[in-house]
Amino acid sequence: MATSSLTPGVSLDENGSIKLFNKFPFEGVEVKDISLVDYITIGNGQPLPHTAGRFQTKRFRKARCFIVERLTNSLMMNGRNNGKKLLATRIVKHAFEIIALLTDQNPLQVLVDAVAACGPREDSTRIGSAGTVRRQAVDVSPLRRVNQALALITIGAREAAFRNVKSISECLAEEIINAAKGSSNSYAIKKKDELERVAKSNR
């Protein structure tokens, strides 16, 4: 393994390409859901999921942000975790190592499959003024599907780890694996099915 002189500590493989966390290759990862291809960005050749807020300057630019960084940022929710990017990055790294051990697949591909699987395609919104309010089923945009999928995955992992002997890395790994399989053991899949069921009843 050669080491780049430009970026100390970054390992390059035989083809000279950078790996995520110096372990997981970006090559071969694909988005199988055609509607989400433009909204799930698989790496910009960066070894760490950290761009220092580069994608927040304009509306909708976050769609071009690396999907692992978006997952890391979602983990920083709840006031006590705000700004702890290093802690969140470490959690994601350990979760990816667990996913690689349990599935023998590239964790990046498993995450992409999980995000595609647990983003709700249909939701319901409130229509009408204060007097008469009813709910109407609406289609969900691809960007919101990705946003909701990431939020549901991280909320599920956080709730599973609360008052549990398992670490949050283990819970996050389990949540991502179950979501990628479409298993009902996943919090994100359960919530997605619930949202779609409510929307179907309000068509």
From Swiss-Prot:
Main subcellular location: cytoplasm
Keyword Kinase: no
An MF annotation (GO) of this entry: mRNA binding
Any Pfam family hit: Ribosomal_S7
Misc remark: There are 2 genes for uS7 in S.pombe.
Domain of life, per lineage: Eukaryota
Organism phylogeny: Eukaryota, Fungi, Dikarya, Ascomycota, Taphrinomycotina
Record's protein name: Small ribosomal subunit protein uS7A
Single GO BP term: translation
Task performed by this protein: Component of the ribosome, a large ribonucleoprotein complex responsible for the synthesis of proteins in the cell. The small ribosomal subunit (SSU) binds messenger RNAs (mRNAs) and translates the encoded message by selecting cognate aminoacyl-transfer RNA (tRNA) molecules. The large subunit (LSU) contains the ribosomal catalytic site termed the peptidyl transferase center (PTC), which catalyzes the formation of peptide bonds, thereby polymerizing the amino acids delivered by tRNAs into a polypeptide chain.
Subunit structure: Component of the small ribosomal subunit (SSU). Mature yeast ribosomes consist of a small (40S) and a large (60S) subunit. The 40S small subunit contains 1 molecule of ribosomal RNA (18S rRNA) and at least 33 different proteins. The large 60S subunit contains 3 rRNA molecules (25S, 5.8S and 5S rRNA) and at least 46 different proteins.
Keywords associated with the record: Cytoplasm, Nucleus, Ribonucleoprotein, Ribosomal protein
Cellular component terms per the entry's GO annotation: cytosol; cytosolic small ribosomal subunit; nucleolus; ribosome
Family affiliation: Belongs to the universal ribosomal protein uS7 family.
Biological source species: Schizosaccharomyces pombe (strain 972 / ATCC 24843) (Fission yeast)
